[in-house]
Amino acid sequence: MKQYISHLKRYRQFAELTQEELAAKVGVRRETIVRLESAQYNPSLKLAVDISRAVGAPIEEIFEFPMQGGIWP
């Protein structure tokens, strides 16, 4: 079960970056970006901040953590 909804692909494309380019900017492998885009990998806070800066969008818009039953999952 996914713990968050990833909007990374949309923001990456809006920033006109390929997966490879974004990976190079934030210092990870392309495979990490693939897993983040499909919400199969939880980013560290540092990585989330680096991605946010690279694509020019707030962390909370890139990685959406929906509330369940009035509490965070």
Regions found by a protein language model. Name each.
Residues 6, 16-17, 43-46:
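Residue-level signal for the short linker/turn that defines the boundary of a DNA-recognition helix
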Residues 13, 24, 53:
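Alpha-helical residues within the helix-turn-helix
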Residues 17-34:
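Short alpha-helical DNA-recognition segment
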Residues 46-61:
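DNA major-groove recognition helix of helix-turn-helix/homeodomain DNA-binding modules
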Residues 53, 63-73:
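Short, charged recognition helix plus adjacent turn
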